[in-house]
Amino acid sequence: MSPCENDPPINWKRNLIVAWLGCFLTGAAFSLVMPFLPLYVEQLGVTGHSALNMWSGIVFSITFLFSAIASPFWGGLADRKGRKLMLLRSALGMGIVMVLMGLAQNIWQFLILRALLGLLGGFVPNANALIATQVPRNKSGWALGTLSTGGVSGALLGPMAGGLLADSYGLRPVFFITASVLILCFFVTLFCIREKFQPVSKKEMLHMREVVTSLKNPKLVLSLFVTTLIIQVATGSIAPILTLYVRELAGNVSNVAFISGMIASVPGVAALLSAPRLGKLGDRIGPEKILITALIFSVLLLIPMSYVQTPLQLGILRFLLGAADGALLPAVQTLLVYNSSNQIAGRIFSYNQSFRDIGNVTGPLMGAAISANYGFRAVFLVTAGVVLFNAVYSWNSLRRRRIPQISN
């Protein structure tokens, strides 16, 4: 994988397409098992309503927790050995773990494997780092926005496919099907992605303090990490109460599950439509403007969600919120590209992933705690307050440093 002067230049557009496919496959693989995770926990011997809820929450959250712990290590290894190698490691490792999950005999085995899944993950942040280091800087927003739609598309289609497969073949076979998808992702990455990378010895690697001092604006980068965390907190805080809130709004209807599923899915559809377009706009006017505007827009949409009277009103607001959310993470990633070098891109994107995983763990806990004490509607108001704080914090960080104009 070491570069050679006679090698043809890397076709970053082809790599973007293949990386998008890889993110789609891993997004689908992760979400395939989500619809029946509590059912599988029950099948492994957990009984009783309280115990089932507790174990379902633990096995769901532990993956993100261990991913947050492991991401910086894999990011450092990516900066030493190359990002393609990390993509291959992640896809193959997760595929093997999925097979073992399908063979689990008790809840403790399953819990350990869910933790191992988090430890071996990291496909998406390494795909982001790979594309960020290859794409022309003036196209970063569009490229990273487009790449983000891969994981979103997979996450949207995965639960539907997982539910159908579980109904048709049972729960355990879905894990083997998921493993097959990840192995396919491994081979697609192996044969179709090109990277010119000169391995770096451990002695030549920058240490943490040197990474921080090499950043153009360390305080801004930290604020971007915090923004990523709050984006995930805001998204996750609504997830535990959404179905119950829809049931409260819908009243006595027979298809609450279908309505809830539709309302849960519409933000992802909106993000698919908005991410590449707003990313391209960010390349033109600046990703910092897109970020602040999308954060303020999110606040203005979250507040009325606490006052809606029908599921249709909630669905419309969530669609608009999804359009704003589609711009947020690509804008953050583009700003990270602008404020760091290729030498440390793997670690910067992995740190960002760690903050994202922490948000994935804390968001649902926050939403559940608020709803238990103050009701469903309070969740939206508190979340709006958190996002508003982040908008002010981000604006204050960004206005201190004008984003440099970077040419090809």
UniProtKB/Swiss-Prot annotation:
It is a multi-pass membrane protein. One of its GO terms (cellular component) is plasma membrane. It comes from the Bacteria. GO terms for molecular function: transmembrane transporter activity. The chain crosses the membrane at residues 16-36, 58-78, 92-112, 115-135, 146-166, 173-193, 224-244, 256-276, 290-310, 319-339, 378-398. It is found in: Cell inner membrane. It holds the Pfam family MFS_1. Its main location: membrane. InterPro entries: MFS (IPR011701), MFS_dom (IPR020846), MFS_MdtG_subfamily (IPR050497), MFS_trans_sf (IPR036259), Mutidrug-R_MdtG (IPR023692), Tet-R_TetA/multi-R_MdtG-like (IPR001958). One of its GO terms (biological process) is response to antibiotic. Keywords: Antibiotic resistance, Cell inner membrane, Cell membrane, Membrane, Transmembrane, Transmembrane helix, Transport. SUPFAM superfamilies: MFS general substrate transporter. NCBIfam families: PRK09874.1 (NF007372). Confers resistance to fosfomycin and deoxycholate. Belongs to the major facilitator superfamily. DHA1 family. MdtG (TC 2.A.1.2.20) subfamily. This is Multidrug resistance protein MdtG. It comes from Escherichia coli O81 (strain ED1a).
